[in-house]
Amino acid sequence: MKLVDEAEILVTAGNGGNGCVGFRREKFIPLGGPDGGDGGAGGSVWIVADENVNTLVDFRHERTFKAQRGENGMGRQAYGKGGEDRIIVVPVGTVVINVQTDEVIGDLTQHGDRLLVAKGGKGGLGNMHFKSSVNRAPRQATTGEEGEERLLKLELKLLADVGLLGFPNAGKSTLIRAVSAATPKVADYPFTTLYPNLGVVSVEAYRSFVIADVPGLIEGAADGAGLGTQFLRHLQRTRLLLHLVDISPALGVYGEGGVDGVSPADQVRTIERELERHDPELLKKPRWLVLNKADLMFEDEARAAAETIVAELGWTAPWYLVSALGRDGTFPIMKDVMAFFDRQREDELEARNAG
């Protein structure tokens, strides 16, 4: 499924109903006092996170959301009925931003999270509130308040455990196909992945994690080059990054905009610079190196090339030599990832118990 991860919507809460000017009219009570009721409150607009929704695509077609207006007050001190709230359902992981102020209003990270984005107006006061010793028959009532209106930007950050990053054509889509049931488009040219893809990796029964295939990054990505920063945000919520590198760039024909002439080590350094420019915290995340396309070389050549790259980078974190296309060496990575998450959970539990 193509994942639309940005949308702008206009939300308008309901206006409050007007207060009523009314007087008590009953038999044998010819001069009844004021009894105009208050108007009902306008409906509010809420955004609710739902785990069964995984895209913002519906907001491409419907961008305006209005809550119901409150009903006017009536005689006999009857209050107007409040307007119904408007509920907007979004995927878990949606960030809501006020376009006018660029302020983050809320971050919906759990199923069922609710966020008030536009509050309904208060109902107007009926004339029963304006009776006094000098004005026993007031003909004064107030109108309902206007509901809030906001232009909002919705951003969807994938809630994935593992993020795949690398240059275009490094083999990220091929890897996610190899280890999960996801079926992203795969072809021999850059920018095949135009939208993030999610896959669930099942290591054992009831033991799995979510992996995200994010479109390839190139130099200048933090400034919007290539597919820009709109996909870098998806890496912010991952717990582990797998950095894929094509170890045989000289054997691949990438075409314009690709990575011709860029050594594997320089590919790693380039992406590290882009991550630091976009969000330095990303470089603090655990990151493992996955040297891909070993099938394009003889085994001893691939191993020697991999060791040279690791030495050139001074890489100290875990690294792997794989062929995503042939699924050679991919499953051991997934087992190690699962074990890494198990250790993380144990450490977090110990820290909570100690605290």
UniProtKB/Swiss-Prot annotation:
Residues 1-159 form the Obg domain. GTP binds at residues 166-173, 191-195, 213-216, 292-295, 323-325. It comes from Xanthomonas axonopodis pv. citri (strain 306). Keywords: Cytoplasm, GTP-binding, Hydrolase, Magnesium, Metal-binding, Nucleotide-binding. GO terms for molecular function: GTP binding; GTPase activity; magnesium ion binding. An essential GTPase which binds GTP, GDP and possibly (p)ppGpp with moderate affinity, with high nucleotide exchange rates and a fairly low GTP hydrolysis rate. Plays a role in control of the cell cycle, stress response, ribosome biogenesis and in those bacteria that undergo differentiation, in morphogenesis control. One of its GO terms (cellular component) is cytoplasm. Its EC number is 3.6.5.-. PANTHER family: DEVELOPMENTALLY REGULATED GTP-BINDING PROTEIN-RELATED (PTHR11702), MITOCHONDRIAL RIBOSOME-ASSOCIATED GTPASE 2 (PTHR11702:SF31). Gene3D superfamilies: GTP1/OBG domain, P-loop containing nucleotide triphosphate hydrolases. SUPFAM superfamilies: Obg GTP-binding protein N-terminal domain, P-loop containing nucleoside triphosphate hydrolases. NCBIfam families: Obg_CgtA, PRK12297.1, PRK12299.1. HAMAP family: GTPase_Obg (MF_01454). Belongs to the TRAFAC class OBG-HflX-like GTPase superfamily. OBG GTPase family. Monomer. CDD domains: Obg. This is GTPase Obg. It holds the Pfam family MMR_HSR1. It is found in: Cytoplasm. Residues 160-342 form the OBG-type G domain. One of its GO terms (biological process) is ribosome biogenesis. Mg(2+) binds at residues 173, 193.
